[in-house]
A protein has these predicted regions:
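A short acidic/glycine-rich loop-to-helix N-cap element
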Residues: 21-25, 122-125, 152-162
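Sec-dependent bacterial lipoprotein signal peptides
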Residues: 1-18
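Short beta-strand segments enriched in hydrophobic/aromatic residues
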Residues: 53, 61, 113-117, 132, ...
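A short gly/proline-enriched turn/hairpin at secondary-structure junctions
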Residues: 58-70, 83-84
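Surface-exposed, charged secondary-structure patches
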Residues: 76-122
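Short, low-complexity N-terminal intrinsically disordered segments enriched in polar/charged residues
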Residues: 18-43, 47, 164-182
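Short, well-ordered alpha-helical segments enriched in acidic and aromatic residues
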Residues: 45-60
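Short beta-strand edge/turn micro-motifs at domain boundaries
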Residues: 127-158
């Protein structure tokens, strides 16, 4: 009888151990969903991209959670950014995905990739490492953080803006001088 009880307990514990959810993997439905998000972003398929986010999703790209974007704001930002680029993509073969389940039972997908985009104002191609981490619930992204360094692109853009401002000022001065000479 004692052996039967011990054997039964051992069987229960081994079954329970086998049923624990995997806490780390590089293959999961959530990773597959995030890959679809990346493809939709690259193809500028905003409806497909939006379909993977919960309506109440909070999105933080290089900002604190208190300044989170909504799904609608994310789509508006992507559409505006798309106007400024001839093309963009994440470099093939340079991306890594992983999924982790936290001690609290939260499911997060991490993505590391190399983003490459041809910026219209500078006619220059920028290559920027990027990291995203997205929390999933019920198959949808409910929270997403993204981190990358845009300093090179921004400095180049500011230089173009400063040059344009100088040209505008020179034009205004020339027009004023011409107007004064006519009087």
């Amino acid at each position: 009888m004692k052996k039967s009880i011990l054997l039964g307990l051992a069987l229960v514990f081994s079954i329970a151990a086998c049923q624990q959810k995997e806490r780390y993997t590089q293959h999961s439905p959530e990773i597959d969903t995030f890959k679809k998000v990346i493809v939709a972003y690259e193809n500028q398929d905003w409806d497909a991209l939006a379909s993977h986010y919960a309506d109440t999703a909070k999105i933080m790209y290089n900002k604190l959670e208190k300044n989170a974007m909504t799904k609608a704001q994310l789509l508006a930002m992507h559409k505006q950014d798309a106007e400024a680029f001839n093309s963009w993509e994440f470099v093939n073969g340079e991306s890594e995905y992983e999924m982790v389940v936290t001690d609290k039972g939260e499911t997060w997908v991490n993505f590391w990739g190399i983003w490459k985009g041809d910026f219209k104002p500078t006619q220059k191609t920028y290559t920027i490492p990027a990291h995203y981490t997205a929390r999933f619930a019920n198959g949808k992204i409910v929270k997403e953080f993204g981190y990358w360094d845009l300093s090179e692109l921004m400095l180049d853009f500011q230089k173009i803006q400063a040059e344009q401002k100088l040209k505008n000022e020179e034009t205004a001065i020339t027009e004023t001088q011409n107007s004064d000479n006519e009087l």
